[in-house]
Amino acid sequence: MDLSNLTLTKIQELVLTKKCKIYDILLAYKNNYELNKDINGYIEFFDDSLEIAKRYDDFLRNCELEDLPLIGMLIAVKDNISIQDKSLTCASEILKGYISPYDATVIKRLKNKGAILIGRTNMDEFAMGSTCEFSYYGATLNPLNREYVIGGSSGGSAAVVAAFQAPFSLGSDTGGSVRLPASFSGILGFKPSYGGLSRYGLASYASSFDQIGFFAHSIEDIALILKHTCGADKMDSTSVDIFDDFYPLKIESLQGKNLAVIKELGEDLMDKNVASSFAKFKFDLLSKGINIKEVSIEEINFILSIYYTISPVEASSNLARYTGLCYGKRMSENLSLNDFYFKHRSNFLSEEVKRRIVLGNYLLSEGYDSKYYSKACEILQNLIIPKFNKLFESCDFIITPTSFVKPFRAGLDFDDPVKMYYSDICTVIANLIGAPAISLPYSKDKEGLSIGMQIIGRSKKDFELLSFSKNVIRELGLNGI
């Protein structure tokens, strides 16, 4: 048996029936990492995870599973989620050397229930990017074809799962940063409803949209980890309870479900391979008795403009704290305070991060706030969110391709940020309206590159979305472990 080709639930089954040790399974994943380090999915593999695995093996020798429902579950973590006594750099030179003094709420909940954190993963610096090429630690490669990007910003978390260097990983999703790399690497990528998981301990990019998300090979794994990490948290006033009676996930017919397709996201806008895959996806669903209707949402044309107005404004505020005085790397030069700030941030932040900070400050400057930022917030709250709420009164889910484009060749788009931003057009919808969404691996092109399909659910109905997705995978025979 290949011990590095398992779901979390299968790992726990083997461990609890004494057929395998946690240590041996973890070692198999570590060996895969050692053999394929060039993928650059991990910034750091935690050596102490092997000691923790040994300790849990000893514990299981004498005890039964009760208070540790996640024992033996191995999870990699994106480098913008705080783990006590571990480095936290957000893949930026400006935070080099910073050690987190506390656990994020999601991390604390995982640890308290027996999960083992096995490493921190690469990302676009401060989660700003769609390719995972904007990292201080270098680009992460796509395990399916190393000449192509993995997608971002959570590319490292996607890569370690796709390359069987971890069975499960945490990422963060602000505008598609979990779903896009999941689509590009042929695995599942799930973004919960806004507030479904506490953001306490997640380094902030755009606080109105940021959400911790999951990568996996199994819907059941996603549902299990969501069950044990979701819920309100006193450390995050935006967190909410989302657990519902759709868990445990049930096997049900797809017959009679109502799906919506957005007219303005037409196939003429897509790469031809994506368009043909999406057409086949719709045909497959129709053949299972699902109803699909095309709806017009003219406001969809504002989606990217709104996202790339609000998110850099919030980023410029959130990243103002990285001055060199409190966190991470610090210069020793004798400068005035303003000169110190200027030189420190100029030297240790990447061009993409500086681009978004400058844009955010410009949009907040006198005379432009009401013209751009306030107007974007007004359109989002008064037009877009109500329009989608109305749509969900007559449909169960919305389907789109995860991305209009296939994975593109690495290194091609550094000088064309607008083209990179365009890859988010389908995924930002769920972030703007606070809804759960998932990317399912659906097809591959002749180069072996993956094309994913996205399903968006109702806000705070995350388990309903996962249940439906499980049945789509089952009835369409989509590949998985």
UniProtKB/Swiss-Prot annotation:
EC number, UniProt record: 6.3.5.7
Domain of life: Bacteria
SUPFAM superfamilies referenced in this protein's UniProt entry, alphabetically: Amidase signature (AS) enzymes (SSF75304)
Gene Ontology biological process: translation
A GO-annotated cellular component: glutamyl-tRNA(Gln) amidotransferase complex
MF (Gene Ontology): ATP binding; glutaminyl-tRNA synthase (glutamine-hydrolyzing) activity
Active site: 78, 153, 177
Assigned keywords, A-Z: ATP-binding, Ligase, Nucleotide-binding, Protein biosynthesis
Catalytic activity line of the entry: L-glutamyl-tRNA(Gln) + L-glutamine + ATP + H2O = L-glutaminyl-tRNA(Gln) + L-glutamate + ADP + phosphate + H(+)
A UniProt-annotated Pfam family: Amidase
Family stated for the protein in its record: Belongs to the amidase family. GatA subfamily.
Subunit structure: Heterotrimer of A, B and C subunits.
Annotated function: Allows the formation of correctly charged Gln-tRNA(Gln) through the transamidation of misacylated Glu-tRNA(Gln) in organisms which lack glutaminyl-tRNA synthetase. The reaction takes place in the presence of glutamine and ATP through an activated gamma-phospho-Glu-tRNA(Gln).
NCBIfam families for the chain: gatA
Name of the protein: Glutamyl-tRNA(Gln) amidotransferase subunit A
Organism: Borreliella afzelii (strain PKo) (Borrelia afzelii)
Gene that produces this protein: gatA
